[in-house]
């Protein structure tokens, strides 16, 4: 732990208490990702919303143009011919009532759960298990669908679901330290555009409050979100 602490302090010393230009910020986070594994790069967006009100909640998906840099395990709850379709599309776990029972019993070795509409009455009883983990299928995020092949392909290619937590903060993983700075910036722009495009109808006053990015083991870096928005608007 001592070496990690020293490394973190050294990395933290390179970060100034200011909002960095977007490309400068991702480059600095990359430079400070010095762990012996490929660190995940995350964005933390503080928004001016209060999610306890339904018209100030944010839950949506973002398609990262440069991918996520990681493989995800997808489970699909369906029946009939859709079982073979889901397996052919690459889902790791596929089943009907038996899979529902397995999940209820604690089988959670998947990162994303997709369900066909006809199975949602069965899936509904898993709310207590899936809800706290953010895994409950939802039509708004494309995880309740009859087109399981397309859904699986999209999520495998880099589509991510995210939501604002109780404090109004959005946490999104948008790449790996091994990505180029330009690719990380492209993904970060997609996150920003998605957050703006899905602004809750009840949001009042200043929507964006702050944006920080960080790597798994590195210090956080503040990003000038206005400059990020300007980059997107210029395209």
From Swiss-Prot:
Name of one Pfam family that matches: Ribosomal_L1
Upper lineage: Bacteria, Bacillati, Cyanobacteriota, Cyanophyceae, Synechococcales
Summary of subunit composition and partner proteins: Part of the 50S ribosomal subunit.
Encoding gene (name): rplA
Keywords: Repressor, Ribonucleoprotein, Ribosomal protein, RNA-binding, rRNA-binding, Translation regulation, tRNA-binding
Gene3D superfamilies the UniProt entry points to: 3.30.190.20, 3.40.50.790
Biological function: Binds directly to 23S rRNA. The L1 stalk is quite mobile in the ribosome, and is involved in E site tRNA release. Protein L1 is also a translational repressor protein, it controls the translation of the L11 operon by binding to its mRNA.
Keyword rRNA-binding among UniProt keywords: yes
A GO cellular component entry from the record: large ribosomal subunit
Gene Ontology biological process terms, A to Z: regulation of translation; translation
Family designation: Belongs to the universal ribosomal protein uL1 family.
UniProt GO molecular function: rRNA binding; structural constituent of ribosome; tRNA binding
Protein name: Large ribosomal subunit protein uL1
């Amino acid at each position: 732990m001592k070496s990690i602490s020293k490394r973190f302090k050294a990395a933290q010393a390179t970060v100034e208490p200011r909002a960095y230009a977007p490309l400068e910020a991702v480059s600095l986070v990359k430079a400070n990702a010095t762990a012996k594994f490929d660190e995940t790069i995350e964005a933390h967006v503080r928004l001016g919303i209060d999610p306890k009100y339904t018209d100030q909640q944010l839950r949506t998906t973002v398609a990262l143009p440069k991918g996520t840099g990681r493989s995800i395990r997808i489970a699909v709850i369906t029946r009939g011919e859709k079982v073979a379709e889901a397996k052919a599309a690459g889902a790791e776990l596929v089943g009907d009532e038996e899979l529902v029972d397995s999940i209820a019993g604690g089988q959670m070795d998947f990162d994303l759960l997709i369900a066909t509409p006809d199975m949602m009455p069965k899936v509904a009883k898993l709310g207590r298990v899936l809800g706290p983990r953010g895994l409950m299928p939802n039509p708004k995020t494309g995880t309740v669908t009859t087109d399981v092949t397309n859904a699986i392909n999209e999520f495998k290619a880099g589509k991510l679901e995210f939501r604002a937590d109780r404090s109004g903060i959005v946490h999104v993983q948008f790449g790996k330290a091994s990505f180029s700075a330009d690719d990380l910036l492209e993904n970060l722009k997609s996150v920003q555009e998605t957050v703006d495009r899905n602004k809750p109808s009840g949001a009042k006053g200043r929507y964006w409050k702050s944006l920080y990015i960080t790597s798994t083991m590195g210090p956080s870096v503040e990003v000038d979100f206005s400059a990020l928005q300007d980059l997107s608007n210029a395209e």
